[in-house]
Protein backbone atom coordinates (compact mmCIF):
# COMPACT_ATOMS: atom_id res chain seq x y z
CA UNK A 1 0.00 0.00 0.00
CA UNK A 2 2.86 2.37 0.86
CA UNK A 3 4.41 1.53 -2.48
CA UNK A 4 1.24 2.55 -4.38
CA UNK A 5 1.01 5.80 -2.44
CA UNK A 6 4.65 6.54 -3.34
CA UNK A 7 4.20 5.75 -7.06
CA UNK A 8 1.04 7.85 -7.55
CA UNK A 9 2.79 11.24 -6.89
CA UNK A 10 5.78 10.13 -8.99
CA UNK A 11 3.46 9.24 -11.91
CA UNK A 12 1.62 12.55 -11.58
CA UNK A 13 4.95 14.42 -11.56
CA UNK A 14 6.08 12.67 -14.78
CA UNK A 15 2.70 13.31 -16.40
CA UNK A 16 2.91 17.02 -15.55
CA UNK A 17 6.46 17.31 -16.93
CA UNK A 18 5.58 15.50 -20.16
CA UNK A 19 2.87 17.90 -21.40
CA UNK A 20 3.41 19.41 -24.85
CA UNK A 21 1.92 22.84 -24.08
CA UNK A 22 3.66 25.69 -25.88
CA UNK A 23 3.73 28.76 -23.65
CA UNK A 24 5.78 30.96 -26.00
CA UNK A 25 4.25 34.38 -26.77
CA UNK A 26 2.10 34.52 -29.88
CA UNK A 27 2.06 37.44 -32.33
CA UNK A 28 -0.90 39.79 -32.01
CA UNK A 29 -3.71 38.95 -34.43
CA UNK A 30 -5.89 41.37 -36.35
CA UNK A 31 -9.38 41.09 -37.79
CA UNK A 32 -9.70 39.64 -41.28
CA UNK A 33 -10.57 42.38 -43.75
CA UNK A 34 -12.93 41.69 -46.63
CA UNK A 35 -11.96 44.01 -49.47
CA UNK A 36 -14.52 45.25 -52.01
CA UNK A 37 -14.12 44.24 -55.64
CA UNK A 38 -12.06 46.70 -57.68
CA UNK A 39 -14.34 48.72 -59.98
CA UNK A 40 -13.95 52.34 -61.10
CA UNK A 41 -15.99 55.31 -62.31
CA UNK A 42 -15.34 58.78 -63.70
CA UNK A 43 -15.41 61.82 -61.40
CA UNK A 44 -16.88 64.82 -63.20
CA UNK A 45 -17.95 67.72 -61.05
CA UNK A 46 -17.93 71.52 -61.27
CA UNK A 47 -14.17 71.45 -60.75
CA UNK A 48 -11.24 72.17 -63.09
CA UNK A 49 -10.15 68.52 -63.06
CA UNK A 50 -11.43 65.00 -63.63
CA UNK A 51 -10.18 61.52 -62.71
CA UNK A 52 -11.20 57.90 -62.21
CA UNK A 53 -11.98 56.72 -58.68
CA UNK A 54 -13.34 53.50 -57.08
CA UNK A 55 -17.08 52.73 -57.02
CA UNK A 56 -16.83 51.83 -53.32
CA UNK A 57 -15.57 55.35 -52.52
CA UNK A 58 -17.82 58.38 -51.95
CA UNK A 59 -16.85 61.85 -53.18
CA UNK A 60 -18.09 64.75 -51.08
CA UNK A 61 -17.40 68.43 -50.63
CA UNK A 62 -15.50 69.12 -47.41
CA UNK A 63 -17.18 72.20 -45.98
CA UNK A 64 -15.73 71.81 -42.47
CA UNK A 65 -12.48 69.85 -42.74
CA UNK A 66 -12.00 68.12 -39.40
CA UNK A 67 -8.36 67.06 -39.79
CA UNK A 68 -7.28 70.32 -41.37
CA UNK A 69 -9.01 72.95 -39.20
CA UNK A 70 -5.71 74.16 -37.74
CA UNK A 71 -4.31 74.98 -41.19
CA UNK A 72 -5.79 78.35 -42.22
CA UNK A 73 -4.22 78.11 -45.67
CA UNK A 74 -6.12 74.90 -46.36
CA UNK A 75 -9.39 76.43 -45.23
CA UNK A 76 -8.87 79.29 -47.69
CA UNK A 77 -8.24 77.00 -50.66
CA UNK A 78 -10.72 77.19 -53.52
CA UNK A 79 -12.00 73.58 -53.34
CA UNK A 80 -11.85 71.01 -50.55
CA UNK A 81 -13.04 67.48 -51.34
CA UNK A 82 -13.00 64.15 -49.56
CA UNK A 83 -12.81 60.75 -51.19
CA UNK A 84 -14.32 58.62 -48.41
CA UNK A 85 -13.65 54.87 -48.14
CA UNK A 86 -16.49 53.88 -45.73
CA UNK A 87 -15.74 50.13 -45.76
CA UNK A 88 -12.06 50.76 -45.08
CA UNK A 89 -12.42 53.64 -42.59
CA UNK A 90 -10.21 56.00 -44.56
CA UNK A 91 -10.34 59.37 -46.33
CA UNK A 92 -8.31 60.90 -49.13
CA UNK A 93 -8.43 64.67 -48.50
CA UNK A 94 -8.11 66.71 -51.70
CA UNK A 95 -7.50 70.46 -51.81
CA UNK A 96 -7.34 72.58 -54.97
CA UNK A 97 -6.02 76.08 -55.56
CA UNK A 98 -5.68 78.15 -58.71
CA UNK A 99 -2.14 79.41 -59.34
CA UNK A 100 -2.22 83.17 -59.84
CA UNK A 101 1.49 83.97 -59.44
CA UNK A 102 4.89 82.32 -59.17
CA UNK A 103 4.99 83.29 -55.49
CA UNK A 104 1.74 81.39 -54.77
CA UNK A 105 3.00 78.40 -56.77
CA UNK A 106 6.26 78.31 -54.77
CA UNK A 107 4.34 78.62 -51.48
CA UNK A 108 2.00 75.74 -52.40
CA UNK A 109 4.92 73.46 -53.31
CA UNK A 110 6.73 74.38 -50.07
CA UNK A 111 3.56 73.75 -48.02
CA UNK A 112 3.15 70.28 -49.57
CA UNK A 113 6.75 69.46 -48.63
CA UNK A 114 6.32 70.76 -45.05
CA UNK A 115 3.02 68.91 -44.54
CA UNK A 116 4.56 65.63 -45.72
CA UNK A 117 7.68 65.99 -43.57
CA UNK A 118 5.62 67.04 -40.55
CA UNK A 119 5.20 63.27 -40.01
CA UNK A 120 8.95 62.69 -39.52
CA UNK A 121 8.45 62.25 -35.76
CA UNK A 122 6.51 58.98 -36.18
CA UNK A 123 7.71 57.98 -39.65
CA UNK A 124 10.49 55.45 -40.20
CA UNK A 125 11.10 56.81 -43.68
CA UNK A 126 9.71 59.19 -46.31
CA UNK A 127 10.23 58.44 -50.01
CA UNK A 128 9.54 60.90 -52.81
CA UNK A 129 8.45 59.81 -56.28
CA UNK A 130 8.18 62.09 -59.30
CA UNK A 131 4.81 62.27 -61.11
CA UNK A 132 5.11 63.26 -64.77
CA UNK A 133 2.48 62.99 -67.52
CA UNK A 134 3.55 65.67 -70.06
CA UNK A 135 0.77 64.79 -72.54
CA UNK A 136 -1.81 65.90 -69.91
CA UNK A 137 0.38 68.56 -68.26
CA UNK A 138 0.20 66.71 -64.94
CA UNK A 139 3.33 66.91 -62.80
CA UNK A 140 3.99 66.52 -59.11
CA UNK A 141 5.50 64.58 -56.22
CA UNK A 142 4.24 61.48 -54.41
CA UNK A 143 5.28 61.01 -50.76
CA UNK A 144 5.25 57.50 -49.28
CA UNK A 145 5.45 57.81 -45.48
CA UNK A 146 6.44 54.58 -43.69
CA UNK A 147 5.87 53.77 -40.01
CA UNK A 148 3.14 54.78 -37.57
CA UNK A 149 2.53 58.20 -39.12
CA UNK A 150 -1.03 59.57 -39.29
CA UNK A 151 -0.85 59.90 -43.08
CA UNK A 152 0.91 57.22 -45.16
CA UNK A 153 0.39 58.79 -48.60
CA UNK A 154 0.56 62.42 -49.70
CA UNK A 155 0.99 63.98 -53.13
CA UNK A 156 0.49 67.09 -55.16
CA UNK A 157 -0.37 67.56 -58.84
CA UNK A 158 0.13 70.71 -60.90
CA UNK A 159 0.49 72.00 -64.44
CA UNK A 160 2.98 74.58 -63.04
CA UNK A 161 0.96 77.50 -64.46
CA UNK A 162 -2.73 77.47 -63.51
CA UNK A 163 -3.66 74.49 -61.31
CA UNK A 164 -2.53 72.84 -58.07
CA UNK A 165 -4.13 69.90 -56.24
CA UNK A 166 -2.87 68.25 -53.06
CA UNK A 167 -3.95 64.88 -51.64
CA UNK A 168 -3.41 63.30 -48.21
CA UNK A 169 -4.64 59.86 -47.16
CA UNK A 170 -5.72 59.31 -43.54
CA UNK A 171 -7.31 56.38 -41.74
CA UNK A 172 -9.80 57.02 -38.93
CA UNK A 173 -7.92 54.93 -36.38
CA UNK A 174 -4.77 55.06 -34.28
CA UNK A 175 -1.95 54.36 -36.75
CA UNK A 176 -0.54 50.86 -36.26
CA UNK A 177 1.51 50.20 -39.39
CA UNK A 178 1.16 46.39 -39.20
CA UNK A 179 -2.62 46.47 -38.81
CA UNK A 180 -3.37 49.01 -41.56
CA UNK A 181 -0.76 47.73 -44.04
CA UNK A 182 -3.16 45.46 -46.03
CA UNK A 183 -5.77 48.26 -46.25
CA UNK A 184 -3.09 50.81 -47.13
CA UNK A 185 -1.76 48.64 -49.97
CA UNK A 186 -5.32 48.23 -51.27
CA UNK A 187 -6.12 51.97 -51.20
CA UNK A 188 -2.69 52.93 -52.62
CA UNK A 189 -3.68 51.15 -55.85
CA UNK A 190 -6.79 53.36 -56.03
CA UNK A 191 -4.70 56.50 -55.47
CA UNK A 192 -2.37 55.35 -58.28
CA UNK A 193 -5.37 54.86 -60.62
CA UNK A 194 -6.63 58.33 -59.71
CA UNK A 195 -3.25 59.96 -60.43
CA UNK A 196 -2.69 58.04 -63.69
CA UNK A 197 -6.15 59.04 -64.98
CA UNK A 198 -6.02 62.65 -63.72
CA UNK A 199 -6.72 65.44 -66.26
CA UNK A 200 -7.12 69.20 -66.04
CA UNK A 201 -10.19 70.66 -67.73
Model regions and ranges:
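Sec-dependent bacterial lipoprotein signal peptides
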Residues: 1-19
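Short, charged interaction patches at domain edges and termini
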Residues: 147-154
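Short hydrophobic beta-strand segments that form the core of ligand-binding sensory/regulatory domains
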Residues: 142, 166-170
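N-terminal targeting sequences that direct proteins away from the cytosol to non-cytosolic compartments
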Residues: 17-88, 105-107, 111-113, 117-118, ...
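A short, structured loop/turn motif at beta-sheet edges
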Residues: 131-136, 157-163
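Second-shell loop/turn segments in exported
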Residues: 92-102, 154, 177-185
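Short, hydrophobic/aromatic-rich segments at coil-to-beta transitions
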Residues: 35-41, 135-144
